[in-house]
């Protein structure tokens, strides 16, 4: 019985799943929007949101925890220098999932996952 076992398996072993979500979290924090399958996006939300909450308070201990979870120095720097201050007044709900149809090859449901207060690229280019 799988009672009280949270999280999706996604047809991967645990080390593959952990590495995949580390990479996806780094990509989302770096680019602030990524396109992936809907189940992966929903599961990625459970990885990224606690990292942003951790980044709200800048301390050496929190930076080490974030590095232990992402293993990427650039990701940790962006988390604590940009995203932590940006989301300081927001109590959770840092990501948004937008469904965007189905993948051509296997008809898998696709989605964009993005950070909610992401600066618009088009607005920045016109100003």
Curated annotation (Swiss-Prot):
Keywords: Ribonucleoprotein, Ribosomal protein. GO terms for molecular function: structural constituent of ribosome. InterPro entries: Ribosomal_bL17, Ribosomal_bL17_CS, Ribosomal_bL17_sf. Transmembrane segments: none annotated. One of its GO terms (cellular component) is cytosolic large ribosomal subunit. The keyword Ribonucleoprotein applies. GO terms for biological process: translation. Belongs to the bacterial ribosomal protein bL17 family. HAMAP family: Ribosomal_bL17. PANTHER family: LARGE RIBOSOMAL SUBUNIT PROTEIN BL17M (PTHR14413:SF16), RIBOSOMAL PROTEIN L17 (PTHR14413). Part of the 50S ribosomal subunit. Contacts protein L32. This is Large ribosomal subunit protein bL17. The lineage of its organism: Bacteria, Pseudomonadati, Pseudomonadota, Gammaproteobacteria, Pasteurellales. The gene is rplQ.
